[in-house]
């Protein structure tokens, strides 16, 4: 057991109890109560964190709605972060959907109505000349991980304005719960650039800047002001872009990925976990990913990010880039992306199919999903459309006509946006389809047997990436580091005995998996020249040192 030195604390009395990072509540020892002027401010009995956590779980269980449970958990987080994470650690699979998807979507929609206490930074456009001051005002000084959103594309719910702050808060809770990154190092930020959500603009309770969103040069200049201020304040920070609209997501990532250590979880994290899951699914079939022919319904930044990651994996398995791209088909509401289409976005261009290569297809001018599945002999289908019900029975039956065990990945979230439910896919495929989803679903009952549904959840990936970056002290995140994360996840999934249908280990095992991913990411950072070389022993020690556990430390009073 690692020895922890006492913490020397300058706060006392009510100020100490008001600090979420330091508050122990009823677990302050008698000596600490005497030394920190807490006598009489707490009930007499001195409790352990285990007994506190038991009470908190009983209270949590008494709430009926998931939103009420989310609000309760956030209240604990804002009063005692150590207890909050102890509770999560002991009930991870049950609590994760409450602090993140799908419940966080409703919390974002209701943000201004359920707001109780400040957390993170609200960087608003009208106060853009004070960004340096805002960063200085952060209650956390040694920030190592920032998650930032502008609230424009929150899950599948669209523009939520500053309500999008719920996403960085939830995401950083998972960095700690799954990746062991201390909450003292984590800072959620929302860029308040207005909102085009008419309901929010008309809502007297809305707490953000009541103005239509700024766009174009105004927007880009504001984001740049923010990025440069972050670089001045915390030059070695890991910055995660979260839930930006696709018109901004890829350009911002491309612009800043060589200026600051950053990544976009919607594009790169989703891609990494999706490819890791797909590799695991192919291994279950005794096949390689490069054997597959893959269709995407949805060609936004997330879908294209996954597709590009798949192309890179196929190249690692021996295909040329051209061969790999010919096996990936992107479909949106206008049909298959081809060289005949105009007004495609820059990130879509590398993934088009050339009509000369489709000359043998029996097609009309509009090439829809079913035609792509039939003519393209598709074996894997991704759903990243954000539109429910688009994977119909006919679509699934067409897949089954191509291969015995098609892989179907409806990844849109929250649950209300999924392209098809696992139950329907299993029924329509007569139990033959291999399924993973983006949101949590219960096991599917088919022919008196329960089939587990793996959640292709970014939480399997981004905490490990973050931990690996911190341990390696990497200056950037390369595509190779993301590929290493995907392979590490697939390898980890093969090491666990899984129930029928499961492609990934249980989420309850995510902390050791994050350590494995972190080590792979750190090694690749060194190989790519993005971190200084260190011995394996040193890297393992850094991973241990950076892996925070929710335990109370002994406090000593700072002397002046």
UniProtKB/Swiss-Prot annotation:
Its cofactor is Mg(2+); Mn(2+). GO terms for molecular function: malate dehydrogenase (decarboxylating) (NAD+) activity; metal ion binding; NAD binding; oxaloacetate decarboxylase activity. Divalent metal cations. Prefers magnesium or manganese. The keyword NAD applies. Transmembrane segments: none annotated. GO terms for cellular component: cytosol. It catalyses: (S)-malate + NAD(+) = pyruvate + CO2 + NADH; oxaloacetate + H(+) = pyruvate + CO2. PROSITE patterns: MALIC_ENZYMES. SMART domains: malic (SM01274), Malic_M (SM00919). Keywords: Metal-binding, NAD, Oxidoreductase. The record marks 266 as: Important for activity. Belongs to the malic enzymes family. Homotetramer. This is NAD-dependent malic enzyme. It comes from Psychromonas ingrahamii (strain DSM 17664 / CCUG 51855 / 37).
